[in-house]
């Protein structure tokens, strides 16, 4: 049996010690919702120039959660391209 340690995005960001992230690619099989909701609520998303996201639709309330994340993300980023529930790319504008 293998035991994995789960760390928060806040801890990882602090450990890396970098203020600016050029590109973040998110494809974590349904975990993207919790990750992005946390990053948006803590303003960590403002430190990322480009974010590429694969949203998965098998998560409960996937469409509503995706819409809410996209709305919040649009305050700091612009969607450059989107294939709904396949891949999308966002570029920071503020």
Predicted regions and their residues:
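Adenosine-cofactor binding site in Rossmann-like domains, unifying the SAM/SAH pocket
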Residues: 1-7
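Conserved acidic-Pro-Pro-aromatic motif
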Residues: 10-94
